């Protein structure tokens, strides 16, 4: 209880600094973020979507480091699929009755539940329908990380695993700019592709009724000793002001893949207390 009070008071001080400071420089939220990301190498970024002003940041070095996007790649893939008219909001992805690794994946899915439950087999079905060349073109148009969709060396698995702790890498800073392009409708895709993707990312209202849109991602590194975790997306205030954020981490969190849960929890804690 005392720790919670201390963290909330520290965040209150940071909010006061953000509101009343006449400077436009970003606020370092280390006092708040350090205990939240304890035991991991974490990063948090919050930007004004319109002006590209950095509102708050934690651990700039980590935020500049590329890592596999894991299931956050579904955001980019959703844009591609809707733009190429491979899917629409009424699409049903039919389960083939074979076990898919998680119980929630063993059923038919929609574009919304594909995003909500991070259904890998749906992503793999979509990538194969779009095709490697077209995906590469989209990655270039999106300026998405290192744009490497080759997959693991000598495994020829780019279309099915490039984003899953494999060849495709992107930094939290690069994710921020990608998210800004989405929320500002500044990508060379159909407006409907952007609108449908954003709609399917909606999760909940924050404590102050600000709307939260987001996507998690998680994966074990090659030696399975560390986990990468993501939570990223948009918040839209009651007044309509838009922000983009990324929470990311790398750490030894045991054998259960919980890194994205931690990244999401940390982000929501910070966003709720910032009360934007």
Swiss-Prot record:
Output the Pfam families linked to this UniProt entry: Transpeptidase
- Catalysed conversion reaction: a beta-lactam + H2O = a substituted beta-amino acid
GO biological process terms, semicolon-separated: antibiotic catabolic process; response to antibiotic
- Write out the catalytic residues in the record: 71 (acyl-ester intermediate)
**Annotated localization:** Periplasm
Q: Is Hydrolase included in the keywords of this UniProt record?
A: yes
Q: What class of enzyme is it?
A: hydrolase
Give the sites modified to N6-carboxylysine. 74
Q: What is the effect of changing residue 74 to A/E/D?
A: Abolishes hydrolysis of ampicillin. Drastically reduces catalytic efficiency, about 2000-fold, with respect to nitrocefin
Q: Which residues bind a beta-lactam?
A: 71, 74, 118, 216, 218
Family note: Belongs to the class-D beta-lactamase family.
Protein name stated in the entry: Beta-lactamase OXA-1
The species this protein was found in: Escherichia coli
Q: Which gene encodes it?
A: OXA-1
């Amino acid at each position: 209880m005392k720790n919670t009070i201390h963290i909330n008071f520290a965040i209150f001080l940071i909010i006061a600094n953000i509101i009343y400071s006449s400077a436009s420089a970003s606020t370092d939220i280390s006092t708040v973020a350090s205990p939240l990301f304890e035991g991991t190498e974490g990063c948090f970024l919050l930007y004004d979507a319109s002006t590209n002003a950095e509102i708050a940041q934690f651990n700039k070095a980590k935020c500049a480091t590329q890592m596999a996007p894991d299931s956050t790649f579904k955001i980019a893939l959703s844009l591609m699929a809707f733009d190429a008219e491979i899917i629409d909001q009424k699409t049903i992805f039919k389960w083939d009755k074979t076990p898919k690794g998680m119980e929630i994946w063993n059923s038919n899915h929609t574009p919304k539940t594909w995003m909500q439950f991070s259904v890998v087999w749906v992503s793999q079905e979509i990538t194969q329908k779009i095709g490697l060349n077209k995906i590469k073109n989209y990655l270039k148009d999106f300026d998405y990380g290192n744009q490497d969709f080759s997959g693991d060396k000598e495994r020829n698995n780019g279309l099915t695993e490039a984003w899953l702790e494999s060849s495709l890498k992107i930094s939290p800073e690069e994710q921020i700019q990608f998210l800004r392009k989405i929320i500002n409708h500044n990508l060379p895709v159909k407006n409907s592709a952007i609108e449908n993707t954003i709609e399917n990312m909606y999760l909940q209202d924050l404590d102050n009724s600000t709307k939260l849109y987001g996507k998690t991602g998680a994966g074990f590194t090659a030696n399975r000793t560390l986990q990468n975790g993501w939570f990223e997306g948009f918040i839209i205030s009651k007044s309509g002001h838009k922000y983009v954020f990324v929470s990311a981490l790398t750490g030894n969190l045991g054998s259960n893949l919980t890194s994205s849960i931690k990244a999401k929890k940390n982000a929501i804690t910070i966003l709720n207390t910032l009360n934007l």
